[in-house]
Amino acid sequence: MALRPAKIDRYVDKPAYTRREYIRGAPGPRITIFDMGNPAGDFEFEVSLHTAEPVQIRQNALEAARTQLNRYLSKNVGRSNFHYKIRVYPFQVLRENPMATGRKADRYGNGMRRPFGKPIGLAARLKKDQKILTVRVNKQHLKFALAAMKRASMKFPCKCYYRIYDKEGNDITTKVLSTL
């Protein structure tokens, strides 16, 4: 079955369904690597991507953003000059009740009888202003980190913004952007 458009699954309109033991065949997470680059490095700045609205982000979008970030930063900055961390985990199991369509569909389709649905993927549930991912870099690579964040935000089905923090965790976005 084809992958549905992300706009179907992005809204957080129902409570999270946390009873995984009732869902037969729940898929495993596609994203397995949450830290890349140089985690032991000492970096001056931390750039974080935040959501502007409550949203569900599918694991496919998280994996696409991860590969895009890794490719861009490795090529332009070098693997030892950055560290990024994905801060969300896809817990929510997405389900779909496949409806039969076409000729004689009423003969073999179930309609709304037993409509629990089959699992089709996983998603991460995010609140407003929650961090999605974080990149740590030094001053000379800050422009590349901001460009990488813009590229990663295009993979998500929501409006995103970034914040720049120093080592102590103070928000210095306006001060740094005025000097760039």
From Swiss-Prot:
It comes from the Archaea. One of its GO terms (cellular component) is ribonucleoprotein complex. GO terms for biological process: translation. Pfam families: Ribosomal_L16. Transmembrane segments: none annotated. GO terms for molecular function: structural constituent of ribosome. InterPro entries: Ribosomal_uL16, Ribosomal_uL16_arc, Ribosomal_uL16_CS_euk_arc, Ribosomal_uL16_dom, Ribosomal_uL16_euk_arch, Ribosomal_uL16_sf. Gene3D superfamilies: Ribosomal protein L10e/L16. Belongs to the universal ribosomal protein uL16 family. PANTHER family: 60S RIBOSOMAL PROTEIN L10. This is Large ribosomal subunit protein uL16. The lineage of its organism: Archaea, Methanobacteriati, Methanobacteriota, Thermococci, Thermococcales.
